[in-house]
């Protein structure tokens, strides 16, 4: 039997407790545990990765800034953005970090192609871009051969908070979102398409819908 990827669709959840839930999942899992992907949205928050520099947070205002343990620099999460946390046994999948990042990017490119949007990845700047504007960000952490954190895809959101930072450390980085490219977006349909892309590109045999939430403490 091939590997399954389990999906939890969690709705809108606060950032910090969700981050701690990821950490617990990775710390407590063993080789028998199914890999999971959590699909969700966050209230407005800036997260500063391990490589982040304070000067890239320009004027956060009333939006909190949280220092976290993923790779990369500062980014923004908010309602209308699809965040997907990838809790994967990378060793079991037989993937190196660069290959994992590439396959996640290809999943997003494939998803966007299903909406007739031509997107590309950049070797020097992880993420996915449409006509030079960033539509999706990536940031991962690997611990004991297992990944956490993941991707953020802009669907139908207020992009103005990105102007308060240098996204991923790039001053003036233009941002875009699916709504501005194709019109109204069905969040649930995007989730369905992304699930299929991730299962295919990451090499799973099938997907499974996991019921129940996560412990937010």
From Swiss-Prot:
Enzyme Commission number(s): 2.3.1.181
Pathway: Protein modification; protein lipoylation via endogenous pathway; protein N(6)-(lipoyl)lysine from octanoyl-[acyl-carrier-protein]: step 1/2
Annotated site location: Lowers pKa of active site Cys: 134
Residues annotated as binding substrate: 70-77, 137-139, 150-152
Catalytic activity: octanoyl-[ACP] + L-lysyl-[protein] = N(6)-octanoyl-L-lysyl-[protein] + holo-[ACP] + H(+)
GO biological process terms held by the UniProt record: protein modification process
Entry keyword Transcription regulation: no
Compartment(s) of residence: Cytoplasm
EC primary class: transferase
GO molecular function: lipoyl(octanoyl) transferase activity
Pfam family name, one: LplA-B_cat
Keyword entries, A-Z: Acyltransferase, Cytoplasm, Transferase
Domain BPL/LPL catalytic stretches: 31-206
Any one GO CC term of the record: cytoplasm
Primary role: Catalyzes the transfer of endogenously produced octanoic acid from octanoyl-acyl-carrier-protein onto the lipoyl domains of lipoate-dependent enzymes. Lipoyl-ACP can also act as a substrate although octanoyl-ACP is likely to be the physiological substrate.
Classification via NCBIfam families: lipB, PRK14342.1
Misc: In the reaction, the free carboxyl group of octanoic acid is attached via an amide linkage to the epsilon-amino group of a specific lysine residue of lipoyl domains of lipoate-dependent enzymes.
PANTHER family according to UniProt: LIPOYLTRANSFERASE 2, MITOCHONDRIAL-RELATED, OCTANOYLTRANSFERASE
Family classification: Belongs to the LipB family.
Protein name, UniProt field: Octanoyltransferase
Organism field: Pseudomonas aeruginosa (strain ATCC 15692 / DSM 22644 / CIP 104116 / JCM 14847 / LMG 12228 / 1C / PRS 101 / PAO1)
Lineage of the organism: Bacteria, Pseudomonadati, Pseudomonadota, Gammaproteobacteria, Pseudomonadales
């Amino acid at each position: 039997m091939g590997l399954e990827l389990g999906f939890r669709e969690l709705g809108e959840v606060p950032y910090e407790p969700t981050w701690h839930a990821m950490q617990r999942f990775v710390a407590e899992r063993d080789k028998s545990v199914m890999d999971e992907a959590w699909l969700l949205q966050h209230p407005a928050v800036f997260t500063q990765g391990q490589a982040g520099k304070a000067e890239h947070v320009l004027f956060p205002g009333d939006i909190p800034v949280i220092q976290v343990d993923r790779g990369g620099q500062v980014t923004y999460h908010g309602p209308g953005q699809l965040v997907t946390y990838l809790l994967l046994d990378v060793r079991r999948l037989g993937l190196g970090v660069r290959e994992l990042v590439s396959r996640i990017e290809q999943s997003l490119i494939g998803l966007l192609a299903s909406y007739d949007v031509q997107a590309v990845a950049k070797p020097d700047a992880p993420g996915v871009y449409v006509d030079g504007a960033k539509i999706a960000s990536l940031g991962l952490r690997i611990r004991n051969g297992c990944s956490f954190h993941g991707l953020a895809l802009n669907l139908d959101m207020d992009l103005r908070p990105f102007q308060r930072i240098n996204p991923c450390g790039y001053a003036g980085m233009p941002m875009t979102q699916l709504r501005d490219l194709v019109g109204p977006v069905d969040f649930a349909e995007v989730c369905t398409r992304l699930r299929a892309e991730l299962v295919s590109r990451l090499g799973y045999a099938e997907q499974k819908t996991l019921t129940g939430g996560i412990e937010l403490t």
